[in-house]
């Protein structure tokens, strides 16, 4: 995610809207991508707990979609977050 710090709250609003729309429209893979983007945003804000929470949601959705490559990528990211205290 390539955004300036001043645009983080705007990005958070757009990601939240994307999550609502993808839930409403049953776009599960896109919903997983939304949660992964949200995790990255929280990671940039320094909120590791929320980053982990959203990445875990993305992983579960990717598993439901059978997106093994994305599961693997997100699990590696989650392990990296877990190492940071």
Give, region by region, the residue ranges found by the protein language model.
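Helix-coil-helix junctions within alpha-helical repeat/solenoid scaffolds
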Residues: 1-85
């Amino acid at each position: 995610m390539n955004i300036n710090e001043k645009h983080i709250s705007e990005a958070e609003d757009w990601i939240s809207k994307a999550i609502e729309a993808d839930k409403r429209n049953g776009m599960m893979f896109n919903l997983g991508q939304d949660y992964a983007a949200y995790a990255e945003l929280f990671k940039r804000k320094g909120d590791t707990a929320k980053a982990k929470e959203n990445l875990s949601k993305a992983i579960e959705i990717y598993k439901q979609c059978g997106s093994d490559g994305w599961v693997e990528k997100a699990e590696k990211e989650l392990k990296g977050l877990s190492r940071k205290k």
